[in-house]
A protein has these predicted regions:
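Charge-biased, low-complexity intrinsically disordered regions
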Residues: 2-226
Length: 226
């Protein structure tokens, strides 16, 4: 899992509709959390069944992502940056694991990375290889650009009976909150079996270079389109 960020990623995969682009960030978040940001890309693909080549990549990754490597994972710069950010927003990273640490636990618990579908397998590969936090949405349910902001007083959230607590950091489009940052996705906006276009979002925190986000999005897109 050596991280090689000095090289630019290869050309865009076919069917990836645009190069990763930065999303918007609410001014109050930019002031409170320097380095916080979101990058997105959209591709003409949905979940579907993973081809054998993608399953083989998961098997190879399982062999490399084990033992001592998984144990020392949190000490690496990118996972550590997310752990620091978790503490800043009131999450204990020893109780609420960062995405890559959750994958490490799943790998050790299951004995391997289990193949689930094209999207989940692609996200597993990208998150495990680079360490960047990724989220996926049904592109047809996204209105405009994605960004990060604080929830408003009494703001509704699909799938939740009560409003979001005010001041919750959310991933949002230009109309509504789509997900709690590092938390639950609103009902009906995540990737589903019928999804044909997927928007991938990479979350940047202080200490995570932009090139790492671009690499993670490229890896996930390439795997989905393989």
């Amino acid at each position: 899992m050596a991280q090689k960020h000095e090289q630019a990623p290869p050309d865009l995969p076919e069917q990836q509709e645009a190069a990763p682009e930065p999303g918007w960030l609410a001014p109050e978040l930019a002031e409170e959390f320097p380095g916080l940001g979101i990058f997105t890309t959209t591709l003409a693909a949905g979940p579907g069944r993973s081809p054998e080549a993608l399953k083989e990549r998961l098997r190879e990754l399982s062999d490399r992502f084990a033992g001592q490597q998984a144990v020392v994972l949190r000490q690496r710069p990118i996972p550590w940056a997310y752990r620091v950010f978790f503490r800043h927003i009131g999450l204990d990273p020893d109780d609420t694991w960062t995405p890559v640490e959750q994958l490490a636990f799943d790998r050790m618990h299951d004995g391997r990375f289990k193949s689930r579908n094209r999207l989940d397998d692609a996200l597993t590969i990208a998150i495990a290889e680079v360490g960047v936090a990724l989220q996926a949405f049904d592109a047809e349910r996204v209105e405009g650009r994605l960004g990060l902001r604080l929830s408003a007083e009494g703001e509704p959230f699909e799938g939740r009976v009560s409003p979001l607590p005010p001041g919750t950091i959310v991933i949002a489009d230009e109309r509504r909150a789509l997900a709690v940052l590092f938390g639950k996705v609103a009902e009906g906006v995540g990737v589903q079996r019928k999804t044909r276009r997927t928007t991938l979002a990479a979350i940047r925190v202080k200490g995570v270079p932009d090139v790492a986000l671009e690499e993670a999005l490229w890896l996930a897109s390439s795997a989905m389109l393989a």
